[in-house]
Amino acid sequence: MKKVMKIIGIVLLCIAALVVVLIVVNTIKTAINNKRVWIPDDYYTAFESDSALEKKYAGLGEYEVKELEFESENKSIDKIRVWYPNEAEDRQYPVILVVNASNTAAINLKPVYARLASWGFVVVGNDDRQTGTGETASETLDYVLNLNKDENSELFGKMDEEHIGCVGYSQGGAGAINAVTRFENSDKFTVLFTGSASYALLSKNMGWEYDVSKINIPYFMTAGTGSSDDAGNSDIHSNEVKEFPGVAPLASLVENYDGITADVFKIRARVTGAEHEQMLQKTDGYMTAWMLYHLQGDTEAASVFVGENADILTNNGWQDVEKNK
């Protein structure tokens, strides 16, 4: 009997050791993956659209881009990363702050930031993977604007502080809404874009509650029609629903759109066939156009959104479009 118990003990010990090894290996693999770039540098070459304008703005701009990184004292932020046009010319560029989706960091999507900066923007991100409250976005904005005033900084005088956009995806969509509405520096932002921002009740349950009625800057909100964004269950106000309605159902976009006052330029639209995880790349073109229009005064980019003949209204890749300008 003692021999049997001894064998059982050895087996249990081996199983426990194996579990520990698997946990350690998985932790190491996760840590390595978290520091990897997840998409190729030329990811934008795969973008497809029937709209010449959307395809144009999903590509590269005219500027060569330089990247800088800064260590943050905030462990959640980890590193602040900045991409900007690498020109000898002494001039300022509009700023775009990107708020990460869940479990995503700027380091994982470097080509996305670099592509956007090539259109003449200072693009700012950080490595926070839980961004929904908007706090780290607000802190990151303060940090880079201080660099803009620091004569010893490589970024001294490069940022146009009168033109600052905020872009957020998924959880980061909630974070972007909070960034432009909840903080002392929220009034620095002049334009907002979100891709599949998590619906209001989901955000509240997760601790990222937002209030769209406080938005007073132009806002372009998007989502996908795929089941991960909209599962067809329109009940977004009850925690008792048996089926998850998706991260950003159409009902959520309608509610958020209607919750913003009519004097604010607002657009809601969905990417036909897009699943939640595809939204960052699927919206690249029109997100860039939205920023060019509002931050650089680009009239061609404005034609994507403004008027009865706006490009977005005739683009078969988009549906459920509602706008007030």
Q: What are these model-predicted stretches?
A:
Residues K2, K29, N33, V271-K325:
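Alpha/beta-hydrolase-fold serine-hydrolase catalytic core, especially in secreted/extracellular enzymes
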Residues T190-M279:
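The feature captures the conserved acid-bearing segment of alpha/beta-hydrolase catalytic domains
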Residues I107-N126:
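Short amphipathic alpha-helix adjacent to the substrate-entry channel of hydrolases
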Residues E87-Q92, E135-A174, R182-F183:
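Gly/Ser-rich "nucleophile elbow"/oxyanion-hole loop immediately N-terminal to the catalytic nucleophile
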Residues G175-A179, S203:
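Hydrolases whose catalytic domains are alpha/beta-hydrolase-1, hotdog thioesterase
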Residues K35-R91:
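N-terminal cap/lid segment of alpha/beta-hydrolase-fold proteins
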Residues R91-A101:
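Short beta-strand element of the alpha/beta-hydrolase
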Residues M1-V20:
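N-terminal Sec-pathway targeting helices
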